[in-house]
Amino acid sequence: MNKSNTISRIGTPLTHNATKVMLLGSGELGKEVIISLQRLGIEVIAVDRYANAPGHQVAHRAYVIDMTDGVALAALINQEKPDLVVPEIEAIATATLLEMENAGNVRVIPTARAAWLTMDREGIRRLAAEELGVATSPYRFADSLKELKAGCADIGYPCVVKPVMSSSGKGQSKLNSADDIEAAWNCAAAGGRVDTGRVIVEGFIDFDYEITLLTVRAIGADGATHTHFCEPIGHLQVNGDYVESWQPQAMHPGALQKAHDIAKKVTDNLGGLGLFGVELFVKHDMVWFSEVSPRPHDTGMVTMASQEQSEFELHAKAILGLPVNVAMKTPAASAVIYGQHDGEVVAFEGVADALRVPGTDVRLFGKPESFARRRMGVALAAAADVETARNNARTAAAKIKPVAHSR
């Protein structure tokens, strides 16, 4: 992409010359992207499937639509006429975005094709493994319980079953024997983001650790697109859902180079500008590709404490064609604050106690409804070393107690 394809100047919000960005998906990650865009003078339109989403609370305008409805999505884009459309979730009518981009009616970040390929696990897995030749775990796809049984038999045990479309680990199961298949099928059906009934079976990799490699495609001073890598982020997942992350994750030099090579190969193919969260499994100097999100990643929330520019600032600047700085300033960690109970109105106790833990900060997302395992906030901690940061982040997160609050 050259300079003619980027935004050459930034207008003034809420005027006729405003530079307008529409976010499709307005959760906690979208909220931080919106804040970063607004600091750069961008007029932001936030869209989500439910009212009062975190990003709705800080945007210039907010809409509630079914984003998988192509007609409704196209109508809203045509109404607002944004300079950029920025998908922040997978469950979007990506075929509509492809049509509109091909017709020259909209610019999608990073590209409509990237949004389409990464909307489910099948598109990106086939691209990485079958087209690009990137190392992945062995896999099969299944549309029925019968096909799932055959897929598990082919892959062997242990294996992992996931819906082809889900988020935050929902619907994932680890299977140790054929006795686990039916429960895994039901779990996937309940946890899928869209009711396709299709799952992926993956061979279980006995990795040492897993990382997110935040990879940024941005315009350089020469007008060409350059790839930048943040320091690797380690993370702990429980049932496929992130509970802690830290930066940097120590890596064998050979493994780090392989991680860079894989991330660049995949993101070069996806194209466009912006930040990508590339998930990888690592065992000594061996690296396997897992997934990629063409947007900020939940494990990357640690960068709000660890980097000169957070992943949200990097994404905002990159998509606008502005310079980026991926430098890390300190080791840091994040720990999730869960809802702990079900309810529509939530209050938080212990925030002051959490902030008394050395080097900590807190982000409460403002979600209007709580579930026991819903991510309602995150504790951040910076320290001289990763272990201290992790301990402090966990300690701070544990001090915050979501409680039911009557209207």
Curated annotation (Swiss-Prot):
Keywords: ATP-binding, Ligase, Magnesium, Metal-binding, Nucleotide-binding, Purine biosynthesis. Pathway: Purine metabolism; IMP biosynthesis via de novo pathway; N(2)-formyl-N(1)-(5-phospho-D-ribosyl)glycinamide from N(1)-(5-phospho-D-ribosyl)glycinamide (formate route): step 1/1. One of its GO terms (biological process) is 'de novo' IMP biosynthetic process. Disulfide bonds: none annotated. Mg(2+) binds at E279, E291. It is an enzyme of class 6 (ligase). It catalyses: N(1)-(5-phospho-beta-D-ribosyl)glycinamide + formate + ATP = N(2)-formyl-N(1)-(5-phospho-beta-D-ribosyl)glycinamide + ADP + phosphate + H(+). InterPro entries: ATP-grasp (IPR011761), ATP-grasp_carboxylate-amine (IPR003135), ATP_grasp_subdomain_1 (IPR013815), PreATP-grasp_dom_sf (IPR016185), PurT (IPR005862), PurT/PurK_preATP-grasp (IPR054350), PurT_C (IPR048740), Rudment_hybrid_motif (IPR011054). Involved in the de novo purine biosynthesis. Catalyzes the transfer of formate to 5-phospho-ribosyl-glycinamide (GAR), producing 5-phospho-ribosyl-N-formylglycinamide (FGAR). Formate is provided by PurU via hydrolysis of 10-formyl-tetrahydrofolate. Homodimer. This is Formate-dependent phosphoribosylglycinamide formyltransferase. It comes from Herminiimonas arsenicoxydans.
